[in-house]
Amino acid sequence: VTAGAGGEAGAVRLDAAIDDFVLYLTAERGFSPHTIRAYRTDLSGLASFAESRGHTTTDALGLDLLRDWLWSGTQAGLARSTIARHSASARSLTAWLARTGALPVDRGVRLRSPKPGRTLPRVINRTQMQELLDSLVLRAGHGEPAALRDLAVIELLYASGLRVSELVGLDVGDVDLDRLTVRVTGKGSKERVVPFGVPAQGAIVDYLRRARPALVAAGSPADDPGHEPAPPSAPTALFLGTRRTRLGVRAVYRLVASLLVEFPGAGPAGPHALRHTAATHLLDGGADLRAVQELLGHASLGTTQIYTHVSAERLKQSYRTAHPRA
C-alpha cells in the first residue's frame, strides 16, 4: 500500500487499500471467486466516486462520502438489494481498514443499508418440472453426449438444490453413487454433504459411462489418428464442456434459460430457479426447515424462511382456485 498525495499523513491510496482488502478476502477469508468479484466491483465503484469528488486516499472515507455514494446509486436507479450490497461492502472495507490501522476508527459502522423489498423467488410447479425432465430424457435417448450431460446437470440441480457455482465446481470424486450423496464446497469454502435421488443417480451414471469419455476425447487431432490426445484441461471435473474444459457457469445459465422459456413466469429463468424449486418442493412435501437450511448451505435460517412464504403463497393460490367461498 502506497501513501497518497494530497491526503492526511499516513493516509494510503484508496485503490491500493482495496487491492489489499480483496487479497485478504481471498487468502484469509476463503471467499468464492464470485463473491470476490462482487466486492471488487462494488469497491471500485466507491473509489471512482471518491475520485470524482477529488479524493484518492483512505482518509476520505467518511460517513458523509459513503452516504453520498449510496445515494448516487439510488438516483441512478439501482435496486435496493444492490444498494444494500454496496453498503455491506463499504462497511466491510472500513472495518478492515480500522483493524489494520489505515483508519483511526471504523467510519462505516453507522452506515445503514436500505431494507431490500421481499421478492418471492421463481418456482416451477411439479407438473412443469416433470415436463421439463421428460423432455430432457427424450433428448438424451439419442445418446448425444451433450444431451446426456445436460440431463445429469438438471437432475442434480433439482435433486440437490445446489448453487450453479457449486455444481460446476464438482469433481468426479465428489460424487458417491453408492450413498447417493455429493460433497459440495459452498460459500466461504465450507463443505457439506448433500443427498440426491435415484433419478439423478441414473442420469449421472449414464453421463459418466456414455458421455463424459466422449467429451474427454473430443477435439483430438483428426489429421493424426495415431496421436495421443492431450489430456483435458480439467481432468477431475465432473461436468465437461465441449472443449474438454470444466463446464462453465454461463453455459449452465444458457441451458436452464433455454429450458424455462417454455414455462413463462415471474422472476429470472436461471439455475437459481431450480434451487428455489427444490427448496419449495421439499417444504411442500413436509421437510423440516432446518434440514432444508442444511441442504442449501444457508448460514442463516432467515434466508431459508423465504421458501415458507413461497409455500404459503402457493397454498393461498390453490385455496382461491378451489374453495367455493374463496
Task: Please state what every model-predicted region is.
Residues 1-326:
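Conserved catalytic core of the tyrosine transesterase superfamily
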